[in-house]
């Protein structure tokens, strides 16, 4: 996950040892997901990030499209605001179309989800599509309760590596 609200939301939905919370790396979640997808081509990789972070790393969409990993999906939780810096309006609230940018970059499958019903229809399908896959998930900017996951980067890294690679990951 990227930083901020997508991390809190992912943790609240259910922590898992294969969740890697990318604290403090604004703009880097999509590229971290690309690296993981290329290194683990038999595993499906889902990056959950926010619109502000995706806007900060737009070049990642072109790089991902050029590499074209079939096992990668990017889900952007888009509230149209920079939630971590005071809720200023983001460019997506001013008409910037992230799914359109992903499509123009060369993503195989792109969508904008405007409702809970459309999200519920998309969720069971994202991992069946050949990637890269991109979804811009429009959500309310209303504050939601925060549940914070572990913030110890070293512990998160080792927990993730062990879940991904097995016990030899600690060596």
Model-derived features with residue positions:
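Conserved thiamine diphosphate
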Residues: 89-124
């Amino acid at each position: 996950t990227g930083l901020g609200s997508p991390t809190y939301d992912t943790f609240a939905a259910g922590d898992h040892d294969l969740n890697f919370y990318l604290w403090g790396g604004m703009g880097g979640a999509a590229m971290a997901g690309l690296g993981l997808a290329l290194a683990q081509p038999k595993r499906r990789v889902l990056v959950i990030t926010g619109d502000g972070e995706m806007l900060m790393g737009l070049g990642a969409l072109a790089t991902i499209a050029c590499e074209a990993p079939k096992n990668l999906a990017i889900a952007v939780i888009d509230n149209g605001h920079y939630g971590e810096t005071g809720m200023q309006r983001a460019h997506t609230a001013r008409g910037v179309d992230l799914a359109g940018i992903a499509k123009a970059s060369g993503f195989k499958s792109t969508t904008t989800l405007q409702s809970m019903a459309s999200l519920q229809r998309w969720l069971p399908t994202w991992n069946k599509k050949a990637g890269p896959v991109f979804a811009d998930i429009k959500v309310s900017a209303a504050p939601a309760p925060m549940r914070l996951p572990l913030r110890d980067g070293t512990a998160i890294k080792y927990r993730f590596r062990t879940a991904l690679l097995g016990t030899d990951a600690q060596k």
